[in-house]
Curated annotation (Swiss-Prot):
Tissues/organs with expression: Expressed in flagella of epididymal sperm.
Originating species: Rattus norvegicus
Phosphoserine modified-residue sites: 246, 326
Subunit annotation: Homodimer.
Residues that, per the record, bind NAD(+): 31-37, 57, 117, 140-142, 251
GO biological process: aerobic respiration; gluconeogenesis; malate metabolic process; malate-aspartate shuttle; NADH metabolic process; tricarboxylic acid cycle
Modified residues (N6-malonyllysine): 239, 307, 329
PANTHER family, A to Z: MALATE AND LACTATE DEHYDROGENASE, MALATE DEHYDROGENASE, MITOCHONDRIAL
GO molecular function, one term: malate dehydrogenase activity
Active site annotation, chain numbering: 200
Record protein name field: Malate dehydrogenase, mitochondrial
Amino acid sequence: MLSALARPVGAALRRSFSTSAQNNAKVAVLGASGGIGQPLSLLLKNSPLVSRLTLYDIAHTPGVAADLSHIETRANVKGYLGPEQLPDCLKGCDVVVIPAGVPRKPGMTRDDLFNTNATIVATLTAACAQHCPEAMICIISNPVNSTIPITAEVFKKHGVYNPNKIFGVTTLDIVRANTFVAELKGLDPARVNVPVIGGHAGKTIIPLISQCTPKVDFPQDQLATLTGRIQEAGTEVVKAKAGAGSATLSMAYAGARFVFSLVDAMNGKEGVIECSFVQSKETECTYFSTPLLLGKKGLEKNLGIGKITPFEEKMIAEAIPELKASIKKGEDFVKNMK
């Protein structure tokens, strides 16, 4: 009975994550044994888009890989343990996803993670620059507002920087905005799309409710409350987990969604749009998240901010100083590395 139930669910999951024909994407997850890494690896293993899944961490990866390898989907899974095995994990990869790092605990901001996670991201991206310089790099490790500039500076140091292939995964902000708007309006969240621009921390998270499809209207007080909830949704989860972690399952879902969109676009699917924190000329910040048209070579076209309301304009103006500081902090970290 259970197996009869499980198969349609598995098929539905696969369909929900991709509409493309089968492909042969080689994907690596760095930080695969962690709270985000394990469920993210499960979702990637479940996708017909992925033919090879290589998992890296400093502990437990052989076990995670063995467990996932028993799942009856086509992706071949292999685990790699410790720095000496990292080069083999990365060779030949098309996409590298990096959720590695320490999670937030109650009372911590994403920025409090900087010192630990900056070193981890710099080390891992240096290996990517050496062993898979052409791969798409998707950074989940917080603070994304600083870890993307770190990644870019590391790739520049190695002479292989391509701004169209480095993405800060902010998809969870869009997923949350879609969910919260759908809850308030009684809509199917799968049919709601709210662009979220800016960055990926606190007030730098700017949901453009005015651009939501389908169109929705909220009184100003409700709009302010909704915006605040989207901005602080990560903290909501950290508090609810009471010291036992941060948003891992929803982040894994959002990370998988972004990877599948990217792979679909790399396969030639047209009209694939996702928001992501990338190098940008849309504002005075050198990095900024906006809707992006994805293509075979990564970022095909930045679709920009579009028409916005005075309320949204004000949020952008207030976010820019914080974003600039976070970006500079990341860039300075790499410049000062020994």
